Amino acid sequence: MGSFARVPLRLTVACGFVASLLVSASAYAGGMDPTPERLVLQPKVGGVVQGAGFCQAVAANPALAAKVGMLPDQLACTPDNVAFKNLVSELGFALAPSTMHSARTTGFGGFVLSLEASYTHINADGVSKGADGSLTQYWHAGTQGSVAPDGTYSAANNSPDSLIGVYTLKARKGLPFGFELDGAVGYVSNTSLWTIGADLRWAILEGFRTGPMGYFPDIAIGTGVRTITGSSKMYLTTVGIDVEASKPITLADEAVITPYIGYQQLFIYGNSAVLDATPGVNAMQQCGYTGQQASGAPACTNKVATGTAGQTVANDGDFNNNITFDPVRIQRNRGFLGVTYRYELLYLGAQFLFDLTSPNSIDPDLNSTRQWTMSLEGGVFF
């Protein structure tokens, strides 16, 4: 009974360790739910870009437009596509398939159930440069922020988290001919986001222990996909294609430790829904909406002065504050190295994943700072 009796104790310790990682997530405060509707460019007046909040102020008080000799619909918010691209790129890096496993599969009939905790560095104070030359702190503007005692959210996230935690329940099942299928569902800390996805890999070379081939490492290729749920504002899907090598080392007590190393090409796909850049203003109420004209324009009973004596126009400017971002298509090159430990039922792992190249070497709109992810895993191997 000796060695086997120690398994429950070790498994309890491992699960307790992973649980402590989950609890530690509460130390990060700030409300990291994406708010892409805040990532807007301000209009120009006399060729000069206006300050932050100007288009929102005009939407709330259309009479301000007449003071600068313009109409409200000429002073609408427009999407800051560069800021959105940076937000999607860094969030996609954090939520992408982690490739946290060795090249050797679980074997036909093998099964692993585990919990993975991953922490990804983001550029919390990162700045993007918009098409008009304006600078935006995309994590400050693009995430929810704190909640006031009256239940209202702040206009910006003044202290975005520098780490994004993702806690994933994974199941891996060995298949014939060296294939393995993974399923994953995860929660993104300090948000309402969840990730779901699956991985498939094929061990090209595995299991040789004797003879000349016994000196070669196990080699596998694989692919994985993750997508998010929990947000009606944006859609994010990541696809990874990887190759890795590993070599199991059997220890004296029959435990197996397996170091591994690999490369992943990551593809990030992001899109936005139609967003209201001025959620505090009811466009239909403001215009006195009565229906749609033959041209498709809203029919409004309320009017607003143009600045010219006696002239008014329909107060329909806020309808122009519905925005959609350009689709985001990004490629990232990532390296990873890690180690797994297996003893009877107990399965543990640790991995470090990192950018091999600067993001802006592939897309000049992106921030140059490289990202990394540290992952820990604990579970059972059947």
Question: Positions of the model-derived regions?
Answer:
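Transmembrane beta-strands of outer-membrane beta-barrel pores
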Residues: A117-H121, V185-T191, W202-I204, T223-T229, ...
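Residues that define the transmembrane beta-barrel architecture of outer-membrane proteins
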Residues: G107-G109, S162-Y167, S192-I196, Y215, ...
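Transmembrane beta-strands of outer-membrane beta-barrel proteins
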Residues: F111-L115, F179-L181, A198, G214-T223, ...
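Detector for outer-membrane/organellar transmembrane beta-barrel domains
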Residues: A220-P327, G338
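Predominantly the C-terminal beta-signal and adjacent terminal strand-loop region
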Residues: G30-V40, R329, N333-G335, T340-F382
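Extracellular loop and loop/strand-boundary signature of outer-membrane beta-barrel proteins
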Residues: S154-N157, A184-G186, T227-S232, N320-F325, ...
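Outer-membrane beta-barrel translocator domains and adjoining extracellular loop/strand segments
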Residues: G126-G130, S192-A198, G230-L236, G270-G280, ...
